[in-house]
């Protein structure tokens, strides 16, 4: 999980999700693409 100030989709499979006020990116294809804003 990468924690970044600005999260962007890395590939086409990445999805932007908002959980408890934080923006997250999850990727079923490549788990390395997981990100969280913070």
Swiss-Prot record:
GO terms for cellular component: cytoplasm; ribonucleoprotein complex; ribosome. Keywords: Ribonucleoprotein, Ribosomal protein. Signal peptide: none annotated. One of its GO terms (molecular function) is structural constituent of ribosome. HAMAP family: Ribosomal_bL36. GO terms for biological process: translation. Belongs to the bacterial ribosomal protein bL36 family. This is Large ribosomal subunit protein bL36. PROSITE patterns: RIBOSOMAL_L36. InterPro entries: Ribosomal_bL36, Ribosomal_bL36_sp. It comes from the Bacteria. PANTHER family: 50S RIBOSOMAL PROTEIN L36, CHLOROPLASTIC (PTHR42888), LARGE RIBOSOMAL SUBUNIT PROTEIN BL36C (PTHR42888:SF1). NCBIfam families: rpmJ_bact. Disulfide bonds: none annotated.
